A protein has these predicted regions:
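Short coil/turn segments at beta-strand junctions that form active-site/ligand-binding loops
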Residues: 92-94, 145-146
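Conserved short N-terminal element of RNA/RNP-binding modules in eukaryotic RBPs
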Residues: 94-102
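BRCT (BRCA1 C-terminal) domain core and associated BRCT-interaction motifs
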Residues: 1-64, 102-183
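A conserved helix-loop-strand patch within extracytoplasmic ligand-binding domains
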Residues: 44-92
């Protein structure tokens, strides 16, 4: 994938995955223009150059998305949204444990972002007992010398297993992994 079509620069998983993949973010009109030029005849009477005669990607600056009003000012700079080699393998030093109710419920966009960023991923079923969670954390810490990141939807976990079980999982995670609450 080379380009991601979006009307707005947004802080979401889909765009994060594209940034990890060094994609250009462009408005959908970019693709429309690209297709139009691709179908322009070789000897166009309008004087336009057909992509078939002279292939060149369209200028990105003409098709930049607009900044979402929800973005903080610090993120409203075009250079923050351009491909950046420093993002390649951003997660390579991390092993993610995703806490989900059912292993198959793992968010596909989240999985894709982790893999595109070079991270490794393990799922943990929150209905398993605390000893299995301890084993998963210990095993993950020992593998590949990577830092462990435990992620999950707090509200969904509490709803699924109850507050007491959630508190036990949280205590075990805090005991074995440095804790940062990003919610």
């Amino acid at each position: 994938m080379t380009h991601h079509l979006t009307d707005n620069y947004l802080a979401n998983l889909s765009i994060a995955t594209s940034l990890l993949s060094l994609c250009q973010l462009v408005q959908p009109e970019w693709l429309n223009e690209f297709i139009r030029l691709g179908t322009t005849p070789l000897n166009s009477s309008s004087g336009e150059t057909s992509l078939e005669a002279h292939f060149d990607f369209l200028s990105i600056s003409k098709f930049r998305p607009t900044f979402s009003p929800s973005l903080p000012e610090s993120q409203k700079h075009f250079n923050k949204w351009e491909p950046n080699e420093e993002r390649v393998n951003l997660f390579r030093k991390f092993r993610f444990i995703c806490m989900t109710e059912k292993i198959r419920e793992m968010d596909g966009e989240l999985r894709d972002a982790i893999h595109r960023g070079g991270g490794t991923l393990e799922n943990f079923d929150i209905h398993s007992d605390i000893s299995k969670f301890h084993q998963a954390l210990t095993r993950s810490r020992a593998k590949e010398g990577k830092s462990v990141v435990v992620i999950g939807d707090i509200d969904a976990i509490q709803t699924a297993v109850g507050s007491a079980a959630w508190e036990a999982l949280l205590a075990e995670a805090k005991r074995l992994v440095p804790f940062f609450n990003l919610s």
